[in-house]
């Protein structure tokens, strides 16, 4: 379970998140919804320990602080909205993120990955593409499929459907729900999409 109590985040002496309290149970998907600039992504970054905040953040009853954050961060999968692609090929991207030493994915692992791609409406031919040829939506869905393979204790997802149509948005929401349920994992997602938010167990409107 992810528990956040009285979270407050300031930037340049301005409070951007004030007294946020929420819980995300194992197997549950909670959506943070709000206008651009209201602090949704900052909440995810606070959970990761990347920015300063006041309040309490706990993962499975372990309080995040200066002593524990590095270890707890290893238990979190994070799919950002935008990220640098320092990889030439999709295959290289997958192996780098999953930290695999072999030259290719094991057959069982690749089968699982391809199943995830099908569920995310990703063309299987993308596996052999150059990374620069991918759209933003394709890159993010590939990262989401990898996050599912990592089997972490918590999944954080930032705007996973920002470049997608309504039908694909529903498929992504269903995939995230499946991950949460099958891996008994809490998921905290950021989205401005009502279509995505309506598929979640709970919606937290961030003012």
Regions found by a protein language model. Give the residues of each.
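The feature captures the beta-strand-to-loop junction immediately N-terminal to the Walker
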Residues: 33-35
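Helix-to-loop junction immediately C-terminal to a conserved catalytic motif
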Residues: 47-48
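Conserved ABC transporter NBD signature motif
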Residues: 52-65, 72
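Q-loop/switch helix immediately C-terminal to the Walker
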Residues: 82, 88-104
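Conserved ABC ATPase "signature" region
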Residues: 108-126
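Conserved ABC ATPase signature
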Residues: 130-134, 138
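Catalytic Walker B motif of ABC-type/P-loop ATPase nucleotide-binding domains
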Residues: 155-159
């Amino acid at each position: 379970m992810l528990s956040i109590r009285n979270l407050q985040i300031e930037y340049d002496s301005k409070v951007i998140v004030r007294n946020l309290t929420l819980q995300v149970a194992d197997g549950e998907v909670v959506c943070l919804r709000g206008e651009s600039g209201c602090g949704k992504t900052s909440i995810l970054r606070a959970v990761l320990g990347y920015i300063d905040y006041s309040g309490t953040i706990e993962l499975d009853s372990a309080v995040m602080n200066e002593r524990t954050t590095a270890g707890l961060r290893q238990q979190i999968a994070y799919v950002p909205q935008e990220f640098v692609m320092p990889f030439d090929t999709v295959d290289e991207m997958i192996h780098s993120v999953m930290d695999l030493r072999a030259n290719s994915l094991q057959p069982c692992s690749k089968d699982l990955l391809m199943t995830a791609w099908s569920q995310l409406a990703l063309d299987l031919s993308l596996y052999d593409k150059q990374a620069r040829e991918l759209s933003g939506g394709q890159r993010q869905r590939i990262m989401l499929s990898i996050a599912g393979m990592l089997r972490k204790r918590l999944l954080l997802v930032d705007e996973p459907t920002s470049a997608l149509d309504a039908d694909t948005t529903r498929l992504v929401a269903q995939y995230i729900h499946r991950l949460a349920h099958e891996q008994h994992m809490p998921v905290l997602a950021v989205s401005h999409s009502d279509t995505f938010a309506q598929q979640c167990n709970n919606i937290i409107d961030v003012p």
